[in-house]
Amino acid sequence: AGEECDCGSPANPCCDAATCKLRPGAQCAEGLCCDQCRFIKKGKICRRARGDNPDDRCTGQSADCPRNHFHA
């Protein structure tokens, strides 16, 4: 409980392996919308469209790539 990131690897530059907390200044440690410990800017495509669904895009507020609300 209380983990902010996966503390499996001490080599992760975003996560303190001893505390499982994000390092100072880091917003995220992993995810499709995380790049070099920072959230990717809003609107960047993180998952290409399939069929008639539009592309999924980063929100700028999270490391996760949200499912587009048009997905079935």
UniProtKB/Swiss-Prot annotation:
An example Pfam family from this entry, by short name, is Disintegrin
Give the residue spans that cross the bilayer.
none
Q: Does the keyword Lipid metabolism apply?
A: no
The record, for InterPro entries, names:
Disintegrin_CS, Disintegrin_dom, Disintegrin_dom_sf
Domain of life (superkingdom): Eukaryota
Motif (Cell attachment site) positions are 50-52
* S-S bridge residues: C5-C20, C7-C15, C14-C37, C28-C34, C33-C58, C46-C65
Oligomeric form and interacting partners: Monomer (disintegrin).
Q: How is this protein named in the record?
A: Disintegrin basilicin
